[in-house]
Amino acid sequence: MRNHIIFFSGGKSSFSVADYVKTNYPNDNILLYFTDTLWEDEDLYRFIFEASDKLELPMLIHSRGITPAQLMVQQRFMANNRVGTCSKELKMKVSSQYLKKGIVPEVEKWHNKHYLKDSNFVSDATLYFGIGFEEMHREGPIRANWKPFKIEMPLIENIIDNNAVLAKHNIRQPRMYDMQFAHNNCKGRCVKAGQGHFKNLLMKDEKTFIELMEQEIVISEYIRYCKQPAIKSGKQPDYMYKDVWEFVSTGKKSNKILNILEGSNYLKSKWRNLGVDNKGQPIKKPYTFMKTLSLEDLEKQPIQCDIWDIGGCGCFVEYEED
């Protein structure tokens, strides 16, 4: 009996891969493996639990116990569409340390564990990814990152209709696809996304867009604040951390947070001194998820953007072990 581990993202492609493995290796030890950023759409959880139930496969859920926004505050770094630290820390590092070193993260949950046929499911396991031919640029890095494991990507080598697989099991697709998102990640808040993606978020889920926009403003100002010599050296206490952490965790807006949000136009004005960066160079503009445009700017002029700039996480590509 062989071991098969499916990286189960909550998307249609990874579900098709799970069905493929179950169909071709019904008597083997198969595991659905989900790394949770705690930032996902509520309907994603409905989908992964229903998938586990109908496929009759065990699902292991691992998490660091923090969201991408909380990670940015901890690291004092704005994850963005050039550097996806949230994907690296909350997904890639979690899974790599567990499967290669046996390190269990802060949060571990099981669903349908009784379907697990052997508790030793990691040894000589084949790892499966829901990567299709349109994402073949991810194939090489994933294979390199996961040596010495054997890697399989059935959607590259086989013609599989995701919607037909959903119909086969009578499972409704995640609602993010109904909202015309290209993937079902992070409730449309993926920081590696582009203008077209965030424009769609603004039109389809304005509440989530506004929450993310405000987090971008506050985290940017907090990072700038932390780069000041007195704070960075520890000579002066960090008077903002508690308020910023509570804001990104619960949405509560203290007076400090309200001052940042209400003064956002001044905070990014050309005549304001934003401080210096790690190299001692002047910080010329606020930190943003996208390179050239803040979400606040996008909200004000949503039509004047590149609608074809979709972007996305590309998990398990940019990762080197510590």
Q: What is each stretch, according to the model?
A:
Residues 1-322:
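Nucleotide-activated chemistry modules centered on ATP-dependent adenylation/adenylyltransferase
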